[in-house]
Amino acid sequence: MKFFVTGVGGQLGHDVMNELLKRGHRGVGSDIAPAYSGVADGSPVTRAPYVSLDITDRQAVEKAITEVNPDAVIHCAAWTAVDMAEDDDKVAKVRAINAGGTQNVADVCKKLDCKMTYISTDYVFDGKGTEPWKPDCKDYKPMNVYGQTKLEGELAVANT
């Protein structure tokens, strides 16, 4: 299969892309930097095709995914600086990336009939449960901006 992986400059996207390539899949990575800027560890992701992409730009998302023409998109891109996300001057940007950018990816995948996997976080819950979460648990209680915006991303995908 051919995958398009967003956020390959980060830890999760880097590892997801490496695992896909290790298993013999083809992949194109993306992140906001002009060129791959993740860990320079010589792993396959560092040599894989790369597309610079700002997921908050709907037209750019559509152009990139259309041109790559993947069988599936694995959406790992996100604002992940949890503490910095709480800064008043950062909240709109965090929401634009984690909710709006995710909505853009979901909309384009739906339009192109392309499978999409969205990676969220346990920060959508408050961590005060006494039992493991059950599949499709909807007991959301985000306690910070990061968790709230990732939940907004989950809901964007679910409602697209």
Predicted regions and their residues:
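N-terminal Rossmann NAD(P)H-binding glycine-rich loop of SDR-like oxidoreductase domains
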Residues: 1-23
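SDR active-site strand-loop-helix element
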Residues: 6, 30, 73-77, 116-121
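Rossmann-fold NAD(P)-dependent oxidoreductase module
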Residues: 15, 19, 108, 156
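Rossmann-fold cofactor-recognition segment
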Residues: 43-58
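NAD(P)H-binding glycine-rich loop region in Rossmannoid oxidoreductase-like domains
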Residues: 55-97
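Catalytic helix-loop patch of NAD(P)-dependent Rossmann-fold dehydrogenases
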Residues: 92-104, 111, 124-160
